[in-house]
Amino acid sequence: DTSDEWITTRTGIRTRHWCTEAESAATLAIAAAKQALQRSGLAPADIGCCVCATLSAPDATPSVACQVQAALGLPENRPALDINAACSGFLYGMGVARGLLATLGGQYALVIGCEALSRLMDPADRATCVLFGDGAGAAVFRLADTPFALTLGARGSDVLHAGGPSRAGSAPITMDGKAVFRFAVDALPKCLHTVLDETQRTLDEVDWVI
């Protein structure tokens, strides 16, 4: 009874993409990173660091970021690392990249968010599986002197044990979707207003909310 209409009505999601057997979070990250670098007009040597946010890396090591580094020919003497912060991973990635550039030098950072969550879900659990898909996005950032506001509210300590999620590969991801939805609807407007206050901007000046 989990029809397309059921999913769209309750989530607003109309389309999701899943990896083929030959694809992974790493291959998606490489494809997105190549496109971002090409569109930036920069050369691989211009990238000062590579940060990849993912919780579904195909390998314990090497990291997805290091696989991107090798595939794109980024300098080997520049930092490349993964971070795991789930939904907020890309935002953390921006902050980590800014810190790396400011500390170690460099002008440009490649930040990637990629997931292959279809490999980690139970297709019979519609409270979770209808919400997630597979994909990757990448952006090249330039270090600037303008203010950078990042508002975070950590709730990463809540754990729902479902037979062994703490042991990689032993159980699918399980989530209380309704509770997460209620939290997101309440938290997002508060975060937006906090960031606007910190950057002395108004809502009328915002073109996109992603």
Describe the residue ranges of each PLM region:
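Flexible, glycine-rich active-site loops centered on histidine and acidic residues
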Residues: 98-133
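Condensing-enzyme catalytic core mediating Claisen C-C bond formation in acyl metabolism
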Residues: 1-22, 123-186, 190-194
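Structural motif
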Residues: 51, 110-112, 139-141, 210
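Short acidic capping loops at alpha-helix termini that bridge into adjacent secondary structure
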Residues: 4-5, 43-49, 76-79, 107-108, ...
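Buried hydrophobic positions in well-ordered alpha/beta secondary-structure cores of metabolic enzymes
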Residues: 7, 29, 36, 47-50, ...
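Conserved catalytic cysteine-centered active-site region
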Residues: 4-27, 55-108
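Phosphate/pyrophosphate-binding loops at sites that engage ATP/ADP/AMP, CoA/4′-phosphopantetheine
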Residues: 32-48, 190-207
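Acidic, glycine-rich active-site loops and adjacent beta-strand->loop/helix elements
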Residues: 53-58, 85-90, 113-118, 144, ...
